[in-house]
């Protein structure tokens, strides 16, 4: 059975943000603006996305 994935794109810079928010972006695998990654849809990933919702765009 295939696991569900989510596309996450960083839309804003991490410069000047809280260290925990920067760590969440790195945990998601995002490194620069307009960088897109596919991550598994798990509760921990959803939590990281919710923490930095103002800097990312999410597609199913």
Curated annotation (Swiss-Prot):
Pfam families (UniProt xref): Ribosomal_L30
UniProt keyword Ribosomal protein present: yes
GO biological process: translation
GO terms for cellular component: cytosolic large ribosomal subunit
Gene3D superfamilies named in the record: Ribosomal protein L30, ferredoxin-like fold domain
Molecular function in Gene Ontology: structural constituent of ribosome
Keywords tagged on the record: Ribonucleoprotein, Ribosomal protein
InterPro entries for the chain: Ribo_uL30_ferredoxin-like_sf (IPR036919), Ribosomal_uL30_bac-type (IPR005996), Ribosomal_uL30_CS (IPR018038), Ribosomal_uL30_ferredoxin-like (IPR016082)
Superkingdom of source: Bacteria
CDD domains tied to this protein: Ribosomal_L30 (cd01658)
Family (UniProt): Belongs to the universal ribosomal protein uL30 family.
Complexes and interactors: Part of the 50S ribosomal subunit.
Full protein name: Large ribosomal subunit protein uL30
Source organism: Shewanella woodyi (strain ATCC 51908 / MS32)
């Amino acid at each position: 059975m295939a696991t569900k994935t989510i596309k996450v794109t960083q839309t804003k810079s991490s410069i000047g943000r809280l260290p925990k928010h920067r760590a969440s972006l790195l945990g998601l695998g995002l490194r620069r603006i307009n960088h897109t990654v596919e991550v598994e849809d798990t509760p921990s990933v959803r939590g990281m996305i919710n923490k930095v919702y103002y800097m990312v765009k999410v597609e199913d």
